[in-house]
Amino acid sequence: VDHSAGLKLNGALSIAQTNSRWQELKRQATTAQLYGVDLKILNKDEITKKYPMMSTEDLKGGVLMPGDGSADPSGVTHMLAKGARKGGAKIYEQSPVETILTKNGRVHGVRVNGQDLECEYVVLATGMWSRQIGEKIGVSIPLYPAEHFYVITEPIEKLSPTLPVIRDFDSSVYFKEDAGKLLIGIFEGKSIPAF
C-alpha cells in the first residue's frame, strides 16, 4: 500500500531495578526465545555501554528486543483503509453507527443514519467506544479508556533518533525519542477510567 506508516524499528529495552523484576524479565525472555523472538539479555554494564546517556546505578539489568518498533497511528489507519478499499471494502466516514444488526444471535449488518447496511462481516474498530457498542448487542468487551499522562521535553542535543523505547516497570514509566525530544509516559497500576 502506498502510504507511510511512520514505522520506526528502534527496538525496546525493558529494565529492572529490583531482583524480583530482574528474575521476571529473564524468565519472560527465556520463554520468548523458545518462540523465536530475537532479544538480548543485558547486564547493567552492557546497558551503560550501549546507552551512555542513561543513568544505570540502580539497575540490575534489562532485556533488549531490537526488532520492536512503533508506528504513526494516523499513517497506519490510512494504510489499512487504502488496503481495505483495494480489497473491495466500503468505508463510510462521518457516519456514526446507531446499532449493530443481529438476527438469531448473528451479526448481519449495521444501521447508519437510519439506513440498514447488510454485510457479511462487521469489524468493530471503535477503540474506546467498543465496550458500549458491544453492550448494545450483549457482547462483553473488557476494554475501557483510561487517563494516561506524558510529558515531552524540549529538544535534547545528541539524543539518538534510534533510541529504543525504554520501559521501567518498577517506576511505572517509559521513555522514547520523539522528533529530537524525549517523550516520558507514566502508566498507573490502577488506571482511572476516562468516563
Task: Report each predicted region and the residues it spans.
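Helical element adjacent to the flavin cofactor pocket in flavoenzyme catalytic cores
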Residues: 58, 62-121, 125, 129
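Dinucleotide-binding Rossmann-like beta1-alpha1 core, especially the glycine-rich loop
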Residues: 1-50, 172-175, 179-183
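Residue-level signal for well-ordered alpha-helical positions
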Residues: 28, 53-54, 136-137
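FAD-binding beta-loop-beta segment adjacent to the flavin cofactor pocket
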Residues: 48-56, 102
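Residue-level detector of anion-binding/catalytic polar loops
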Residues: 38, 90, 140
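Active-site substrate-recognition segment that forms the wall
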Residues: 1-11, 99-107, 115-195
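Short aromatic/hydrophobic contact patches that present stacked aromatics
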Residues: 12-16, 62-64, 150
